[in-house]
Amino acid sequence: MAKEQYDALIIYADKEHGSNFEYFTGFIPRFEEGLLIIDKNGKATLVLGNENLKMSKHSRIGANLIHYPQFSLPNQPMDNEKNLTQIFKELKLYKNKKIGLIGWKMFTTQNEEPSELFDLPYFIVDALKNSLSTDTIVTNAAHLLIGPKGIRTINNANELAHYEYGANLASRCILNAMNQLKIGMRETEIGALLSDEGQAHSVITIAAAGERFENANFYPTYKKIKFGEAISMTTGFKGGLSSRTGFLINEERELPENQKDYLERVVIPYYKAIVAWLENISLGMLGGELYEIIDKTLPKASYHWHLNPGHFVADEEWMSSSLSKNSQRQIASGMIFQIDIIPSVAGYTGVSAEECVAIADQSLQNELKVKYPELWERITSRRNYIINELKIDLSPDVLPLSNTVGYLRPFLLEKNKALKVK
């Protein structure tokens, strides 16, 4: 804040867009909206609706509480009703020269000024502007949290331990689903295997066989899976996502007639890119350098992947990404990445082995080893499997947070065969 001369930050949250707010408070306002206002001296104020008033005393950071019942659900009591503009005036925000608004999205457009785009509800932005003098500058400040130097892009040992729980859980679910696949199962049965321990998902659960998006549907249905179909499965929790796509067959000769070369045309080139990603990422490397390595290994012009080949993971599945063309952001200790390469070859089923890893220097690795020995044992076991069984020369800076990093079975009825490096 001080470096960029912000006098105050206003951080917005709702159920779908609460991670920046939750980073400071430890909770989201669920079915209500909420605001966290932090001034340059560290004083914090929570503005909450009816059903979150009780949460203020549990906040990670100490904060004054203001009840704003308009954040509550429709037709609930409007006791203590206040005008939001008046609340902002009472907080004397009009005395500030520069205020940052933080929703969840950091805009990276080239054709508009990103700092002038706001993803908060209009009634909040309008109330704020009506409370300020014309001299006060208001900008989007999400980059302070999730931008190239954002504080949420670097995790300490405790944060890694918490996020490993979600990544581990996702990979356990995906492996369990892969192992239990059998012809005649319903998509909903598979979807049930992709949930566990009552945890909230960070993405929509995918368990889709055959034709995707029938009737514009994203969700698992009662459709029974059939031999020879393609199937996609995805699950994610705070800390990581696991995803797999392949065929419901046992061996290569059972591939569809028009995709007999599926392994050579799609799967093996993709797997080589995953291997290159895991073997080359390292501390100090520029994001643009890893991007170029992936582009050389799996040429974008031929395989038509159009998103980033990886991105930051935290509470949200995609927070932001430093892995873009010409990115000058250095890979740093404490970063968590989703390996996310999505090839699209006309006429062929896709392939996916998305997983989550952390990057850690020796100091952070030593801290994890001492403070979280069980976590470190899991990481060591995963590294040993990747190096010794899959024959991937895993970068020493990479800590696999999930159990299935580098593990790809394209023929999902064959439970005992996976790709490995020759």
Task: Enumerate the predicted regions with their spans.
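Active-site neighborhoods and metal-handling regions in enzymes and metal-associated proteins
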Residues: 1-422
